């Protein structure tokens, strides 16, 4: 594997982990600033090597999946996020891109508003009556929070006024004013309850209560900033006009909204808001800048995960100085050993900060960090900050070097660092308690075996009490044994046992993904399952045969081959099957027997489609005998190029591969 491939894999794994913590668990471990840094690094690397972009990369999607504790609502119109800029130069570059795409030399009229630091929600009104509400979730599916949203007094249960559409889905931010946040924490300290780190966490925790009566006691509020569904009615043709119409119908809208007719006016708005930020009474982390004209918005369109006509201009992260008192080492699912700085506690932007990730040995070397050093900590709205630099001019005399362990701090196994990789790994595998915990958490996760109710804390206890050593042990658990865990009553224990029983019926692709084979994400697992059809065929495959699977190269093929060559892994798989884990037998499709122009061809989709979603297109292509790959190579037979097709199209043309557009694809699908 090339070094850049390893960097991309590690970055994507890290970002997905933090997206899960932020969007699903409402328990972020890093700051927005650190997440943004990682995302920028990933974008920059993918820009260098667009052929390595994967469909499941965090740059290609929004956010993370919802919890199953709530019912789920599928967004009819996806809830996209915004791209970010962090300085004036980046904003001016964004402004120029917009003007260039519009082929205009005239200034764009921008609508500027506050970037609230709360929880994004959608609220659906039918004939003016509130009928449902949902969180953003993963942008496609969110959690049904209707009962809780109905308790927020700022949100009208019925719109008032004239010309209300038959169906109107408004989008906005639920947040907690500073005074309400302080009162919640004051009450929590007095009663021994949970003290929240910041207003955003408090708002998320309040809104996602299973008991709406608790939500009703929290002083949440709401500002509307956009629209999703619009049926049976009309709205003004400008963004500001729509906000004013929402206000006329009784929906709360921020009064800090301004039209700006030049880039300089936008910058002035940004700096004025930044200056007033401490006195607003609620948290913001930047300003949002949108093209005011809806016609121009439509002309500009979207990229994969964000509109081209809007951007979030984020404030600089806030910084403080403190001392590194120690460095500890944590072990992840794949054995990656991550150094964590233990800091002299310091208040940064209203939050007491006591630790920060140092990523890897290369980062420590880059910083020139030693234990005892005075460092600059940067934080911008999250819980765990980043170490920006070392204050060498104030280095104490008693500092000492940070020594990476030669043995795993958890299990004592040897550690290794493969040449060209940034990560040091424990070689202990499942004998390592830390890896065992993380592997089991991955195994039961929603996108893997999807065991409802089997949370991280339960896994931690099961491993620590030595009830569970391998995934197969999970299916041997009884309600009686689970009842002995902390905060686990008989009913909850039985629910977990029932969920485990339900999870036994899965798919071959989910099962492969759940095994946690290194470098095998959901897309690769699906490709392996589709290509080989059966577990027996996959286990018997050679490295050369594995490389025939679309998107599987020598590195992934080697990891898969080595995994199945390991006797202990085969033993665990045998135990899982013996415990009743199963999936439907494969439906064998002979491409030669399918009367379709796509039969037997390896197809790559690139660019955005306007007539159907990418997932729908993939499903229809596969049904017609095609193999859909994520990157263009000599194995590719056909490339389907949608709007704004980029490097994949260029590579296809370079290799002389047949290229068709979306209209031709639709014609052939109907052939």
UniProtKB/Swiss-Prot annotation:
GO terms for molecular function: DNA binding; DNA ligase (NAD+) activity; metal ion binding. InterPro entries: BRCT_dom, BRCT_dom_sf, DisA/LigA_HHH, DNA_ligase, DNA_ligase_AS, DNA_ligase_CS, DNAligase_adenylation, DNAligase_N. Its cofactor is Mg(2+); Mn(2+). Keywords: DNA damage, DNA repair, DNA replication, Ligase, Magnesium, Manganese, Metal-binding, NAD, Zinc. It comes from the Bacteria. Residues 593-671 form the BRCT domain. NAD(+) binds at residues 32-36, 81-82, 113, 136, 173, 290, 314. One of its GO terms (cellular component) is cytosol. It catalyses: NAD(+) + (deoxyribonucleotide)n-3'-hydroxyl + 5'-phospho-(deoxyribonucleotide)m = (deoxyribonucleotide)n+m + AMP + beta-nicotinamide D-nucleotide. One of its GO terms (biological process) is DNA replication. Belongs to the NAD-dependent DNA ligase family. LigA subfamily. This is DNA ligase. It comes from Salmonella typhi. The gene is ligA.
